[in-house]
């Protein structure tokens, strides 16, 4: 494409049906072959099979894999801490999601709450394989799962990844009375708590 990182979302990305988080216990459909959810979703074999999920990316250190034989498991052993090196896994996880999709499977990426670690990995995947900038990828995932809030350390790594992919960044870290946050959080910063890594 002529302007990498600034294209509009392709029709294939916009096509998936919205799934209510409340109806199915904390899962959201990000693309036709990618789901994002909290850790409890990974224990619901019926739900996983009903959604056509064949691969589970477990982005936690605290939740064990269930190791059911019908699913492929990928472990990303990270704490939800700003210093955790999630960027080391961006390419590996994105490549796996893409590979599963090409085989007509679907991937669930989960962490404990489905808010920070798993959302960060989904955003990185969208940048790499759907050729969208960081801001657009974040807005897309947030529209599907409004509770997402990657911690500030993960934002820094996403910004670096966007620069690596596209040579520029569409999100900046800014100083607020509550600490340094990504500019997409600036309007909400008075509501942020230390839990979010500020």
UniProtKB/Swiss-Prot annotation:
| Enzyme's top EC category | hydrolase
Catalyses which reaction(s): O-phospho-L-tyrosyl-[protein] + H2O = L-tyrosyl-[protein] + phosphate; O-phospho-L-seryl-[protein] + H2O = L-seryl-[protein] + phosphate; O-phospho-L-threonyl-[protein] + H2O = L-threonyl-[protein] + phosphate
- State the UniProt keywords alphabetically: Hydrolase, Protein phosphatase
Cross-referenced Gene3D superfamilies, in alphabetical order? Protein tyrosine phosphatase superfamily (3.90.190.10)
* Keyword Hydrolase attributed: yes
EC annotation from Swiss-Prot or TrEMBL:
3.1.3.16, 3.1.3.48
Q: Which GO terms describe its molecular function?
A: MAP kinase tyrosine/serine/threonine phosphatase activity; protein serine/threonine phosphatase activity; protein tyrosine phosphatase activity; RNA binding
Can you tell which superkingdom this protein's organism belongs to? Answer: Eukaryota
Q: Which residues form the Tyrosine-protein phosphatase domain?
A: 26-167
Q: Name one Pfam family in it.
A: DSPc
- Annotated active site residues, numbered on this chain, are 111
Please give the InterPro entries that the UniProt record associates with this protein: Atypical_DUSP_subfamB, Dual-sp_phosphatase_cat-dom, Dual_spec_Phospatases, Prot-tyrosine_phosphatase-like, Tyr_Pase_AS, Tyr_Pase_dom, TYR_PHOSPHATASE_DUAL_dom
Q: Does the keyword Transmembrane helix apply?
A: no
Q: What does this protein do?
A: Involved in the inactivation of MAP kinases. Dephosphorylates ERK, JNK and p38 MAP-kinases. Plays a negative role in TCR signaling by dephosphorylating MAP3K7 adapter TAB1 leading to its inactivation.
Q: Which family does it belong to?
A: Belongs to the protein-tyrosine phosphatase family. Non-receptor class dual specificity subfamily.
Q: How does it assemble?
A: Interacts with CD28.
Q: What is this protein called?
A: Dual specificity protein phosphatase 14
């Amino acid at each position: 494409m002529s302007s990498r990182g600034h294209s509009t979302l392709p029709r294939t990305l916009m096509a998936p049906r919205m799934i209510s988080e409340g109806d199915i216990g904390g899962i959201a459909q990000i693309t036709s072959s990618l789901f994002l959810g909290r850790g409890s979703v990974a224990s619901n074999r019926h739900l996983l099979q009903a959604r056509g999920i064949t691969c589970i990316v477990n982005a936690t250190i605290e939740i064990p894999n269930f190791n059911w034989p019908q699913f492929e498991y990928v472990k990303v052993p990270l704490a939800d801490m700003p210093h955790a090196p999630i960027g080391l896994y961006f390419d590996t996880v994105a490549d796996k999601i893409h590979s599963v999709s090409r085989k007509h499977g679907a991937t669930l990426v989960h962490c404990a709450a489905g808010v920070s670690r798993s959302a960060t990995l989904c955003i990185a995947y969208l940048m790499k394989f759907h050729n969208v900038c960081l801001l657009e990828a974040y807005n897309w995932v947030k529209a599907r799962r409004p509770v997402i809030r990657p911690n500030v350390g993960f934002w820094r790594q996403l910004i670096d990844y966007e620069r690596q992919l596209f040579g520029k960044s569409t999100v900046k870290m800014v100083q607020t009375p509550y600490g340094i946050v990504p500019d997409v959080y600036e309007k909400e910063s008075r509501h942020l708590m230390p839990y979010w890594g500020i």
